[in-house]
Amino acid sequence: MNRKVLALLVPALLVAGAANAAEIYNKNGNKLDLYGKVDGLRYFSDNAGDDGDQSYARIGFKGETQINDMLTGYGQWEYNIKVNTTEGEGANSWTRLGFAGLKFGEYGSFDYGRNYGVIYDIEAWTDALPEFGGDTYTQTDVYMLGRTNGVATYRNTDFFGLVEGLNFALQYQGNNENGGAGAGEGTGNGGNRKLARENGDGFGMSTSYDFDFGLSLGAAYSSSDRSDNQVARGYGDGMNERNNYAGGETAEAWTIGAKYDAYNVYLAAMYAETRNMTYYGGGNGEGNGSIANKTQNFEVVAQYQFDFGLRPSIAYLQSKGKDLGGQEVHRGNWRYTDKDLVKYVDVGMTYYFNKNMSTYVDYKINLLDEDDDFYANNGIATDDIVGVGLVYQF
């Protein structure tokens, strides 16, 4: 493949994972694209919980139908399948995305279903590493931080066609909490959700501006009611002074970010804070896991795309939990105050053979203090991880 063509193609694939989709049908205003990937992935780590085969396959489709000159219907579905388990072993596949919507020309689009929360609009800029990254505060099914369900999203590009580069989104998320005693409100459609993955009603918004020389600036905010179960757990934990589970009836997150993407150079940085929503340790907020009162998060990424297909990457990520719980032995109380929850340097490299085939290595250099009892007590790994993968995508 021509090197200049490859240099232009690779960044496009990174921005839009389905840009390489196979067109299945395109006739009479109806279009259907199929996309997917298979990642033969292996982790190497002294932590037994991370070391080993992590291979997976992913498949999805995007469809749209032209209703009239101004109105277009669309939908997307994406599914993930772990291929590192024995045949017949349960809980090895799940739906990542599933939503349907309408686009009203320059007036924007509206969709509902399982989709990305608007906070991720900014986080996506730094979530660009070969394997790791994007994990200081972004957690799946935790409010509107990452992929989540029950979200109604309105998006507008170029501000109704009046201001090129000015984009915004508005989002509403319905109640998702466990049914049964103590659920209190809503439909109880949360099933067997872990405590940290419950949520009350909430809203979010994001905005960004794309300059014509490759620079983008953005910000996002969300605020939600916490579930009755979360509030009750936090209240009870506060009464016994352990402080492992955040109190308060509202969960909030905000973030600001910037990226530069031009001349084969990619730079991105973001800062974010969360309150009463980010879980740490095991159990998704249950068992030996906890929910932080507050986190402060920072991520920065730098990459360069060579014409012959090589893309080196370096990043720094840190999340600091504030006013955390758990007994601090040498002081004899139940508060650790501030602790790093995530802290590492990432050095990676991807090589693209062509638009369908690539290989990568990603080295996560963990900077958490392995001698600090906080991490062992909360099930937080302090070991380095090296991920090596071979990817086929279409």
From Swiss-Prot:
InterPro entries: Gram-neg_bact_OMP, Gram_neg_porin_domain, Porin_dom_sf, Porin_gammaproteobac, Porin_Gram-ve, Porin_Gram-ve_CS. It is found in: Cell outer membrane. It comes from the Bacteria. It is a multi-pass membrane protein. The keyword Transport applies. GO terms for molecular function: porin activity. Transmembrane segments: none annotated. Residues 222-242 are annotated as: Disordered. Keywords: Cell outer membrane, Ion transport, Membrane, Porin, Signal, Transmembrane, Transmembrane beta strand, Transport. Residues 1-21 form the signal peptide. CDD domains: gram_neg_porins (cd00342). One of its GO terms (cellular component) is pore complex. GO terms for biological process: monoatomic ion transmembrane transport. Belongs to the Gram-negative porin family. Forms pores that allow passive diffusion of small molecules across the outer membrane. PANTHER family: OUTER MEMBRANE PORIN N-RELATED, PROTEIN YDDL-RELATED. NCBIfam families: PRK10554.1 (NF007841). Homotrimer. This is Outer membrane protein S1. It comes from Salmonella typhi.
